[in-house]
Each structure stands twice: as C-alpha cells, then as structure tokens.
Amino acid sequence: MRALVLAAGKGTRMKSKIPKVLHPLSGRPMIEWVIETAGKVAQKVGVVLGFEAELVRKALPEWVDVFVQGEQLGTAHAVMCAKDFIEPGDDVLILYGDVPLISENTLKRMIEEHRKGADVTILVADLEDPSGYGRVIQDGDKYRIIEDTDLPEELKSVTTINTGFYVFSGDFLLRALPEIKNENAKGEYYLTDAVNFAEKVRVVRTDDLLEITGVNTRKTLVWLEEQLRMRKIEELLENGVTILDPATTYIHYSVEIGMDTVIYPMTFIEGKSRVGENCEIGPMTRIVDCEIGNNVKITRSECFKSVIEDDVSVGPFARLREGTILKKSSKIGNFVEIKKSTIGEGTKAQHLSYIGDAFVGKNVNVGAGTITCNYDGKKKNPTFIEDGAFIGSNSSLVAPVRIGKGALIGAGSVITEDVPPYSLGLGRARQVVKEGWVLKKRKEE
C-alpha cells in the first residue's frame, strides 16, 4: 500500500504568506498530522507540493518521497505529477495535506473494502448541506461523481458527498490518468473522472465530520482547533484528570497527563509535554515540551523544554527555560528564572534569582537575589555549586566559578574565585558606621 498526499495548494483564502499545510493545528503543522496517519497504513508515502515547495519540504520527514506540481491544474494533474510513485501491482491511497484529521481507522476500513476487489474505493459522507461538495450518484451497482459546479438542478438534492479520499488500484489508475480531460467549468483535471471510468467501485461511509473537514480559511482552522481541544479535554476527564475550567484550558492533543492531576484555569500545556500523577498545574501557567513527574506543583509560571522530577514545587511567577532539570523535591519560588541548569535534589531557590548554565548540587540554599553572572560578553560560562552549600542573599557568582561542598557565601558578596569546601566566601566592602553623622550634617545645613 502506498499513500499519496496532495499538498500543492496555496490557500489563498487563508490570506497568509505561509503555505496552508504548514499552519498549525494543536501545535503541529496540518500536513504533519496527515503524514503521521498515512505512515500507519502505508509502506511508502509520497507528497505532491506546489506553493513554497522548498519551505514545505523542510517540514517533512526524510523518508517521504516528494514531487512538485509546478502549476495547479486540479487533483488529477497533481497525481500525474507523481506518476513515478504509482506502481502497477500496488494500491494507492489519496490523501490531502489540508484535511488533517482523517483517522487511521477509517483508512483501514477503506483499504479492507478495496481489497475485496475494486478499481477504486471512495470515502463518502451524508451532509445536511452538501453545497460545495461533489456528489456521489449511485445507479444500480455503479457510481459516478459530479462536481458541485457541474451538477444539474435535478441532482442538487443528493446529500451523499465525495470526501475526496480514495484507494485506487495502481494498474487502474495508470490506465485512467491519460484519459482524464479538463472539459468542465473550471478547466481542471479532476481525479473524480478516474472514478467515473471505473467498473468496480466500492464505497465506505463516515459520519465523523471532523475527519473530512478541509481547511480553507482561518475560521475553519479555529473551529477544528476548538473541536480537537474539547475532544482532548473529554478524554482526560474520562481518564481521571480534573480540569476545573475547560473553557479556559488549552491542552494539545499530543499531551499526556496522569490521573488525579488537577488543572486550574488559564493553563496551557503544549507540544509533547507529559505530566505525571497527582500534580497541581496552574492557574495561569504555560508548559511547553516538558517532562513532569508525580506530585509536582506549578503555579502562575512558564516552563519550556524542561525536566521536572517528582515532588517539585515551581512558582508563582517562575520561568524555566530550555535545558532546565529540577531534581526530586527541589523548590523554585517567585520571580526565579532558570536556564540550561541542573538543580539538585532538595535544593531551594525561592526568591528573585537568576540561575543560568549552572550545576547545583543537593540541598543547596540559594538566597534571595542570587545571580549567576554567566555571560562575559563573548560566551556563556558555567557555575558549579556543590552539595549543601549556602548562598547568602543578594550574592553575585561571576562565572566560571565553583562553590565547594558545604561552603557558605556571605550575603551581598560578589564571588569571582572558587570557594573551597566548608569555607566562608565574602566579597564585599567592610561596613562603616559613623555615629551621630546625621545630626551633625543637619546642623551644618
């Protein structure tokens, strides 16, 4: 089985410089949804590109065969551009890059039906308002498809539509393609004409509107996004996740969340994030591509491409940037930013700190206002803080620098040299007190 994805269209009605198939749906380009599903049912996958072909090609996996349709002259013309992909002894599944939610189950039903002996198998649906769609007309055991623009008045009441999804016998398709003409209202080469040439046609029906909805406008894309969002929320609710306000919660379809986790309002969980069991996430929190363990609490914070182990507390108002690893039972508090750093088990950084390019050991106390000065104007430098160290408030650690095990840094210090284990590090001017100075100054005035 081969699958050919037609994705050459510009998407004029999207009013965008971005190719239509690259617009995201639940965090992934539309065409990525189609390629993934195609790869589950077919041994080879090909894609026909057109508008901004090179840009779309970069978004495709390397194992996909790519063909280019220089001028968009219809669906049959697109398939002709990939003629070398079609093998006489193999079946071909036709999919579309802007119809992203076609299901694996439906495609398997089509393939199974086709293998009962057909030149072509069509996926059809019945719509209350079929306007704009080609109609599937049955005459005994024969079927033909008429495009909406070419439909005679007496057939406009037919509600069975052609979804555009087909399985063709490779032998039949190679014979039919040269016979297709562009004698229609739009002057295009329609793949539906190949169906009309077929002697053996089989039909599979779907009643799932989502999987046959094509995206031609941003309005449709937003509608699909909302339907997919609610499907995901319903799935999570059924699997033991509490979502306090579904109306303000946005969770991408690829996200995994464990049971007894509570999601508070205004929370966004995106990408390939995985959240463990018995967590509290939100409110007003955004999580992107993170691995989160069990019993984690994150509130009013942002976390990007980070790993958060069990029993960790984050926030409020913390920011975890890419490359952050928070070990078990660590605590990150308000207005703390961490970038490309590992925070050891039981370590606390609870107030107003920046930790970047650092390796912090176990049970370290990072005092309020601590800054790792990692950038020297040319490159980023590392800071090492070993187990059990105590960093006093308002300290600046000028990297590269190492704070030894159990060392103590006095509050307000600027540390520019390594501090050995169990040592006191001070880097500040001695306090000066001038008794009675204020009263004396007032008298002078």
UniProtKB/Swiss-Prot annotation:
Annotated region (N-acetyltransferase), positions in chain: 240-445
PROSITE patterns for the chain: HEXAPEP_TRANSFERASES
Region feature Pyrophosphorylase, mapped onto this chain: 1-218
Residues that bind acetyl-CoA: A368, N374, Y375, S393, A411, R428
InterPro entries listed in its UniProt record: Bifunctional_GlmU (IPR005882), GlmU-like (IPR050065), GlmU_C_LbH (IPR038009), Hexapep (IPR001451), Hexapep_transf_CS (IPR018357), MobA-like_NTP_Trfase (IPR025877), Nucleotide-diphossugar_trans (IPR029044), Trimer_LpxA-like_sf (IPR011004)
Pathway(s) served: Nucleotide-sugar biosynthesis; UDP-N-acetyl-alpha-D-glucosamine biosynthesis; N-acetyl-alpha-D-glucosamine 1-phosphate from alpha-D-glucosamine 6-phosphate (route II): step 2/2; Nucleotide-sugar biosynthesis; UDP-N-acetyl-alpha-D-glucosamine biosynthesis; UDP-N-acetyl-alpha-D-glucosamine from N-acetyl-alpha-D-glucosamine 1-phosphate: step 1/1; Bacterial outer membrane biogenesis; LPS lipid A biosynthesis
Molecular functions per Gene Ontology: glucosamine-1-phosphate N-acetyltransferase activity; magnesium ion binding; UDP-N-acetylglucosamine diphosphorylase activity
Cofactors (names): Mg(2+)
Locations listed in the record: Cytoplasm
Pfam families noted in UniProt: Hexapep (PF00132), NTP_transf_3 (PF12804)
Region (Linker): 219-239
Active site per UniProt: H351
Binding site for Mg(2+): D98, N216
Chemical reaction(s) catalysed: alpha-D-glucosamine 1-phosphate + acetyl-CoA = N-acetyl-alpha-D-glucosamine 1-phosphate + CoA + H(+); N-acetyl-alpha-D-glucosamine 1-phosphate + UTP + H(+) = UDP-N-acetyl-alpha-D-glucosamine + diphosphate
EC number, as in UniProt: 2.7.7.23, 2.3.1.157
Residues noted as binding UDP-N-acetyl-alpha-D-glucosamine in the record, renumbered to the chain: 6-9, 20, 69, 74-75, 96-98, 134, 147, 162, 216, 321, 339, 354, 365
Quaternary context: Homotrimer.
Family, per entry: In the N-terminal section; belongs to the N-acetylglucosamine-1-phosphate uridyltransferase family. In the C-terminal section; belongs to the transferase hexapeptide repeat family.
Task of the protein: Catalyzes the last two sequential reactions in the de novo biosynthetic pathway for UDP-N-acetylglucosamine (UDP-GlcNAc). The C-terminal domain catalyzes the transfer of acetyl group from acetyl coenzyme A to glucosamine-1-phosphate (GlcN-1-P) to produce N-acetylglucosamine-1-phosphate (GlcNAc-1-P), which is converted into UDP-GlcNAc by the transfer of uridine 5-monophosphate (from uridine 5-triphosphate), a reaction catalyzed by the N-terminal domain.
Protein name according to UniProt: Bifunctional protein GlmU
Native source organism of the sequence: Thermotoga maritima (strain ATCC 43589 / DSM 3109 / JCM 10099 / NBRC 100826 / MSB8)
